[in-house]
């Protein structure tokens, strides 16, 4: 059963009861997932930018947008308009497919994985996690990568607070660390 179908048929009714909501539309849901990779070396190395665009597209199934510097910063040797990263926003079916792969395939492949931190909520029910290596995703072949690079994954929900957001992600199968 896909995550989207499981959310509609099992998770939504359970959260409605657990969080004492009177209306189904009050139940928190995932709005979007943002995958971002900052590339400091992209200013000097164009190949790293191309490799990152390809990797993020392979992982998410959607072509990422190249983010550019808004201002020149001499200390970082970047000028305005230089590429400094890649980002992609997933919604709908692609979002649910990505979340399912992240929770069930990618996170368990992290070395010494004991669960994700419960402290990474932002106060409004949104969750951000940093991934140190892109090779945890099964779509990325170890032979084809030129360097190990991480990424930030933000899960935006309609939850009003962290407790609701955590309840939603826990029901979806997010492996939280037992403190």
UniProtKB/Swiss-Prot annotation:
Pfam families with a match to the protein in the record: Ribosomal_L5, Ribosomal_L5_C
Please give the biological process terms from Gene Ontology that the record holds. Answer: translation
Q: What gene is this protein translated from? A: rplE
Annotated Gene Ontology cellular components are:
ribonucleoprotein complex; ribosome
Name the chain's protein. Answer: Large ribosomal subunit protein uL5
- What does the UniProt keyword field contain? Ribonucleoprotein, Ribosomal protein, RNA-binding, rRNA-binding, tRNA-binding
Family in the record: Belongs to the universal ribosomal protein uL5 family.
Any one GO MF term held by the record is: rRNA binding
Q: What does this protein do?
A: This is one of the proteins that bind and probably mediate the attachment of the 5S RNA into the large ribosomal subunit, where it forms part of the central protuberance. In the 70S ribosome it contacts protein S13 of the 30S subunit (bridge B1b), connecting the 2 subunits; this bridge is implicated in subunit movement. Contacts the P site tRNA; the 5S rRNA and some of its associated proteins might help stabilize positioning of ribosome-bound tRNAs.
Describe the subunit structure.
Part of the 50S ribosomal subunit; part of the 5S rRNA/L5/L18/L25 subcomplex. Contacts the 5S rRNA and the P site tRNA. Forms a bridge to the 30S subunit in the 70S ribosome.
Database matches in PANTHER family: 60S RIBOSOMAL PROTEIN L11-RELATED
InterPro entries referenced in this protein's UniProt entry, alphabetically? Ribosomal_uL5 (IPR002132), Ribosomal_uL5_bac-type (IPR020930), Ribosomal_uL5_C (IPR031309), Ribosomal_uL5_CS (IPR020929), Ribosomal_uL5_dom_sf (IPR022803), Ribosomal_uL5_N (IPR031310)
